[in-house]
Design a protein with these regions (language model features):
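Family-specific signature for flavin-dependent thymidylate synthase
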Residues: 1-129
């Protein structure tokens, strides 16, 4: 394998890109994981479809703990934060109750957009451009 200096690599990329030939950077692909975001955030991310996404399933992954994201604006208000935590705990209590009696894909309907999720993203360099 021949090694090339960074300047030469940059020139090789800059020429076709400056001529509008962006397909050359579609061959470099990146896969990364985004962890601990809310489902509300993940839905905003995937709705634009600039990449391939695999999101943690609420159907096949047990949602045993009240694992959720609290928006900063709620966290700054002590009473609002307290009520938010109480509500999340209550939602999980009801989810656990339902998941013992109905299929998990039906029980998950009560889970909020605040649920923590993980998502794997794969995209090429052009999508990151």
């Amino acid at each position: 394998m021949q090694e090339e200096d960074e300047g030469r690599i940059e020139r090789r990329l800059r020429a076709p890109l400056s001529a509008g030939h962006h397909s050359v950077i579609e061959h470099a692909a990146f896969t990364f994981s985004i962890e601990g975001i809310s489902r509300a955030s993940s839905h905003q991310l995937v709705r634009h479809r600039i990449a391939s996404f695999s999101q943690q399933s609420q159907r096949y992954v047990k949602m045993e703990n009240a694992d959720y994201v609290m928006p900063e604006s709620i966290g700054r208000d002590e009473e609002a934060a307290s009520r938010y935590r109480e509500l999340m705990d209550r939602i999980w209590e009801e989810y656990r109750f339902l998941s013992e009696r109905v299929p998990k894909e039906d029980a998950r309907y009560v889970l909020p957009n605040a649920c923590v999720t993980n998502i794997t993203v794969t995209m090429n360099a052009r999508e990151l451009w």
